[in-house]
Amino acid sequence: MKHLLSLVCTLGAATLAASAAAEAGSMPSANGLDFVIDGEASYFAGSNAYWLSFLTNNADVDLALDHFAESGLKILRIWGFSDVTAEPSDNKVYFQLHQNGSSTVNTGPNGLERLDYIISGAEKRGIKLVIPLVNYWDDFGGMNAYISAYGGDKPGWYTNDKIQAAYHAYVKAVVSRYVDSPAIFAWELANEPRCSGCDTSIINQWATKTSSFIKSLDPNHMVAMGDEGMGLPGDSNYPYSYYEGNDFALNLAIPDIDFGTLHLYTTDWGVSNNSWGNKWVQDHAAVCKSAGKPCLFEEYGMKGNHCTYELAWQKTALATPGMAADLFWQFGENLSSGQTHNDKYTVYYGSNEWKCVVSDHVAAVAVRRYRLPVGGGQHGP
């Protein structure tokens, strides 16, 4: 029996390998409550590395992508934006300049050519990239960089015609550039879009229009909000409340939104009970299951004590129908210039924490992978 089981596993692995090779050029997609990558419908693990987009040393990019792929991680979320209001003098990477009432996309060596290199490298290694196209926050320019050039305020960003025209022009420049790349997992409308105190219709209408626009440019790839998952019924407390202008279920129902996204930062949100995060994951999964679309648990982390709490959240996500993948915040690396930015959430490759947050989790994902029915997001016996 032992030898038979070994033979079955070997043949199964060979079949999966052959299937993956045959489907390696296919585009990631959603199938029911599952994601499909390289022809395989399964649960996937990954991370975030915002800093990758701004590296200028190709060897550093290669090192990071190699370590990521070798670790068994599959989905990597990187920034697809870097908005400035004055052209940098130090060859700093930026993607768009907003100045004097106009916007210019930087397609040069310190612009979108940096994304070109990353995406090419991801293609070679079978890594799939989630790319948000603007930041709500001021880091790397954000929405306020548009406002500096065109006027207005944050709540008005979503409805300002001049701002939206510039944003759409940038979206078109980026999305059209990579329409045929199998490395793109999904385009995201923004990183953590909010509209504090606004009616939820503002973000919903903006997301409906923008997701349709992206699909018209690129029908090959998935589109998602990139939001934190705020706005759920049954609890009036933050972040379940609708204060930030988001309605998770309403936005998930948009036809051109392919999956739901959620983030989890108990400390930042003023939640003292970290086990609260398990319910946050389960409640979103229930909405995704009802909508028939998968959930991507795309950002989560703790400032220190990563193994204790993040492991619990990972186990909950892995065990909950409706959750299809998770990406911890964030992947850290030792580059030629030193360590990448340590925001206290960072888990560095090769560290002791890497084993529990990454290696052990990847192994658990592999166990589930062979028990997961296609399209159902359910468990085997």
Curated annotation (Swiss-Prot):
Gene3D superfamilies: Glycosidases. Its EC number is 3.2.1.78. InterPro entries: Glyco_hydro_5, Glycoside_hydrolase_SF, MAN-like. It catalyses: Random hydrolysis of (1->4)-beta-D-mannosidic linkages in mannans, galactomannans and glucomannans. Its main location: secreted. It is found in: Secreted. Substrate binds at W79, N191, Y265, W329. GO terms for molecular function: mannan endo-1,4-beta-mannosidase activity. Keywords: Carbohydrate metabolism, Glycoprotein, Glycosidase, Hydrolase, Secreted, Signal. GO terms for biological process: mannan catabolic process. Glycans are attached at N100, N273, N334. Residues 1-22 form the signal peptide. One of its GO terms (cellular component) is extracellular region. The active site is at E192 (proton donor), E299 (nucleophile). It holds the Pfam family Cellulase. Endo-1,4-mannanase, a crucial enzyme for depolymerization of seed galactomannans and wood galactoglucomannans. Belongs to the glycosyl hydrolase 5 (cellulase A) family. This is Mannan endo-1,4-beta-mannosidase D. It comes from Emericella nidulans (strain FGSC A4 / ATCC 38163 / CBS 112.46 / NRRL 194 / M139). The lineage of its organism: Eukaryota, Fungi, Dikarya, Ascomycota, Pezizomycotina.
